[in-house]
Amino acid sequence: MSNQLSPKPPVNPIVMGKIGSAYGIRGWLRVFSSTEDADSIFDYQPWFIQSKSGWQLVEIEGWKYHNQDLIIKVKGADDRDAANLLTNCEIVVDSSQLPDLGVGDYYWKDLIGCQVVTVTGYELGKIIDMMETGSNDVMVIKANLKDAFGVKERLVPFLTEQVVKRVDLSAQTIEVDWDPGF
């Protein structure tokens, strides 16, 4: 019997990846990581998944690369049927584990929900998602209901200095130099 305290469920949950399909017959599973370097997902422990009864701790026995896939062995999932029960579950950790960022760097989770306003004061809408492209991140902005340009959604590059002029996370606003008609 262990004297270790059981890890506490996340207070500020953040999704770090997703458990994919079973791999083989011994309970291994594919993992899809949302971290910049795929295997960095293992730096954030403990993992939790959301189940009908609440947060469930996921203990990793091991992990490895197989071809281009990351695969994991979860404690208690010793066959394909047990592994299949975890398929499509989101991997969640407490956001307090994320490292502090430097000035001018932001986590996407902090940008989502911010109101985006042009330098002329036109409200473009709220960020509902972020996308990664080959060259830069892009804000997915849901336009206001009565948008003068009839736009429902805008894609605006998150380029500091060129497009993004000011980010105020405490006020949940981002000022951009962007043509609302574009």
From Swiss-Prot:
SUPFAM superfamilies the UniProt entry points to: PRC-barrel domain, Translation proteins
InterPro entries for the chain: PRC_barrel-like_sf (IPR011033), PRC_RimM (IPR056792), RimM (IPR011961), RimM_N (IPR002676), RimM_N_sf (IPR036976), Transl_B-barrel_sf (IPR009000)
Keywords on record: Chaperone, Cytoplasm, Ribosome biogenesis, rRNA processing
One Gene Ontology CC term in the entry: cytoplasm
Family the entry assigns: Belongs to the RimM family.
Keyword Disulfide bond listed: no
UniProt GO MF annotations: ribosome binding
GO biological process: ribosomal small subunit biogenesis; rRNA processing
Predominant location: cytoplasm
Domain topic, free-text comment: The PRC barrel domain binds ribosomal protein uS19.
Disulfide links within the chain: none
Domain PRC barrel: 103-182
Function description: An accessory protein needed during the final step in the assembly of 30S ribosomal subunit, possibly for assembly of the head region. Essential for efficient processing of 16S rRNA. May be needed both before and after RbfA during the maturation of 16S rRNA. It has affinity for free ribosomal 30S subunits but not for 70S ribosomes.
The keyword rRNA processing belongs to this UniProt entry's keyword annotation: yes
Quaternary assembly: Binds ribosomal protein uS19.
Localization per record: Cytoplasm
Protein name, UniProt field: Ribosome maturation factor RimM
